[in-house]
Every structure is written in C-alpha cells, then in structure tokens.
Amino acid sequence: MSPELEKVIHDLTLRMLLIRAIQEGDSPSSLTEREALILQQLLERPQMTISEIAESWPNVSESTISMTITRLWREKAYVSKIIKPDNQRVTLVQITDKGKTAIQKHLAQQAERYNTLFQAINATPEEKEMLIRICRRGIEYLDTHLAQMQKPTAKP
C-alpha cells in the first residue's frame, strides 16, 4: 500500500471514529465494537454458546468474550442466558428484544454516518459504483482471510 493511501485510510477511519464518539458520547446504551459484533452474531443465530461465539474471535480469549457477554447480560439486558436443558454445564446466549433494538439503532447510526459522508463528498454514480466494486473485493478477501483464521490448527 502506498504511504499516501495508508494515510488517507487512517485519517478517514480516525475521523469516522471521532464522529461516532462525539455522537454517542458516554451513553450507557452505546455499544463497543465487540458488543456490536456479538449482538450481530446473535441476530444471525438466535442461540449460541459462549464457545461458539468465541470461535469467531481467534485472537480473543474465551474469558474475554464471556466477560463481554456478562456485561451485555447484567448491565445492559441485551442478551439472556439459558441453561441448556439436555446439558446443564452449557449456557446458551440469546439476544433480547432490547438487544435487537440496540443493535438495529447502532447499525442505523453507522449507516447514517456513511450516508452523510457520501452525500457530502457528492460522489458521481460512477464513483459510487467503483467504490462498491472495491468494497466487494475487500469483503471477499476478508471473508477468505477470516475463514482461514478460524480454522482450528492441528495439534502435534
């Protein structure tokens, strides 16, 4: 990556994060990135074990994921925990209606920030189409990379 492109991406990311921080402030209902991603996982799969959720986070310990889920459960009531009936050693996590509302609001705010940006820069239809193609290629690469990261490593 060229130094200029690296700087532009860094600067854009920083400014988007600053705007998010200013808009959300220290609201107790605001979500960290990890909380938001866990809630998105639970939207896709309504019941998951903590281990299943943690599998998506190869460089994050299961205890860190467990602490995040506990915060979503105790402090925010965005998830509920259920003991699995056929194996009482396993706890299932599911998103609550309050959690669904929170993640939908979070995603809507995120979309609004990008919409505001794209309207402000007055991109032409061709530029928007090019950006879509570039983003899709990036998503394709990242999906492949994530799949590789999540594969269990063979133990000697």
Name each region found by the language model.
Residues A108, E112-P156:
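Terminal interaction helix/tail motif
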Residues T13-M16, R20, K76, I139-D143:
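A structural signal for well-ordered alpha-helices, especially hydrophobic packing surfaces
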Residues T68-R71:
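Residues within the DNA-recognition helix of helix-turn-helix
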Residues K7, D11, L37, M130-R137:
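Amphipathic alpha-helical interaction segments
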